[in-house]
Every structure is written in C-alpha cells, then in structure tokens.
Design a protein with these regions (language model features):
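An aromatic- and glycine-enriched ligand-binding surface/loop that stacks and positions planar moieties
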Residues: 1, 81, 88-92, 104-207
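Conserved, well-structured interaction surfaces
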Residues: 1-52, 75-82, 88-102
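Second-shell loop/turn segments in exported
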Residues: 2, 67-75, 126-127
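Short, hydrophobic secondary-structure boundary micro-motifs
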Residues: 25, 57-61, 150-153
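Short coil/turn linking the two alpha-helices of tandem helical-hairpin repeats
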Residues: 49-56, 99-100, 120-129
Length: 207
C-alpha cells in the first residue's frame, strides 16, 4: 500500500509550492526546508519505483478533493527513477553546507541516498558505468565530510543513536531528540481523519 508514501509526497509538494513565497531571516533557512522537501520526495519515489515500478508522478500538491487530477495514471518506472535523480540533485544544490542534522536531511544524508540510488540504477536498471561513478562520487563526499567520524568506543554506537558515525536516523526513544518521530517522513494512519479512511480517494487509475 503506497498511501502513506503519497501522503508524504503531497506534504512535500505543498512545502515546495508555498515555501518560496515565505520571508525568512536567511536564505539558508529557506533552502534547508526546500532541500528537506526534495529529499523526502526523492526518498518516497525511490521506494515506490523499486516496489511498484510504474507509478503516478505527482509534483503538485492536493489541497481539495475538488481538484483536477485526483485519479492520476501510472507513469513508466523509468520516469519515476528519473524524478528521483532530479529531486536528489535539487536537494544537494539547495542544502547549505553548514547543516549537520542527523534526524533530518543534510548533505551527507542526501549523498548516501544518491549513492544508493545510483548503485540501484547501475545494478538493476542497467544505467552503465556513469551511474557507478556517480555512486562513488557521492560516497567519497560523505567519507570526506568532517561531520562524521568513527566512534573511539564501540559501545557509543549503540548508546547514542545520533552519534558521530550516524549519517541519518529516525529518533524513536523518548527525549533522545525532542519531537523526533518517523511521522516526519511517513504519516501513521492514526493521523488520518476517519472521513478519509471511510471514503478514500483512489490514487491510481488501476484501482
């Protein structure tokens, strides 16, 4: 069921739609939010492409059940993966180098997604040596990032799940990181209204 993934994609689309018109104290703060939205959308479409292949590509947010396009058709898997690559590149371009978050997107997290993506493209989608080179470039960028280092004490890897070796993590433990929960990326069903559950809007034309 890809409902949660598309709910998250819709949230990212709305962020990308409205954030550019909001006044921020700094351009970096705005770009960080936009980069996170691109990263999350890439993350979701990457899963969708690998699990379902052909799938709808939605880039405009839905705000009403009266909008056009509520029953999108599936696009070829190749187009889905192309969208993933574009979103990853946009996220990397916008993400300020100073960001070192481990429970949100950062250049390190985006590069690891990029590496995973290009390895998949090389091995499964037969994208050729260029994809392998792109994966290697992304990995090297993370290895050369001073925000990450090996823990001196092996136990610290498990004691602090947002420690020096961690590039990206979801925080589950209470007070480990205030407000941290996986709903930032996948919306749990308990947060969906009863009306939506009882009368869901179909996502794909194949349903």
């Amino acid at each position: 069921n890809w409902a949660d993934l598309y709910t998250t994609i819709n949230n990212a689309n709305l962020i990308l739609k409205y954030t550019p018109d909001i006044a921020f104290n700094s351009e970096d703060a705005k770009n960080k939010i936009l980069a996170n939205a691109y990263y999350v959308r890439a993350f979701c479409y990457y899963w969708i492409g690998r699990i379902w292949g052909d799938a709808p590509i939605l880039l405009d947010g839905f705000e009403s059940d009266q909008q056009e396009g509520l029953f999108p058709v599936r696009q070829p898997a190749e187009d889905v993966f192309t969208q993933v690559g574009e979103d990853i590149n946009n996220a990397l371009t916008l993400m300020p180098a100073s960001v070192s978050d481990r429970n949100l997107a950062s250049s390190g997290a985006i590069n690891m997604l990029k590496a995973d993506y290009y390895l998949w493209m090389y091995k499964v989608r037969n994208a050729g040596e260029v994809a392998l080179d792109n994966a290697n470039t992304a990995v090297q960028a993370v290895l050369n990032n001073s925000n990450y280092s090996l823990e001196e004490n092996f136990n610290n890897i498990f004691y602090n799940e947002l420690g020096n070796e961690i590039i990206f993590a979801w925080s589950y433990i209470q007070d480990e990181y205030t407000g941290g929960y996986p709903g930032d990326y996948l919306v749990p069903s308990q947060y969906v209204s009863d009306e939506a559950i009882e009368n869901p809007v179909k996502v794909g034309s194949h349903q």
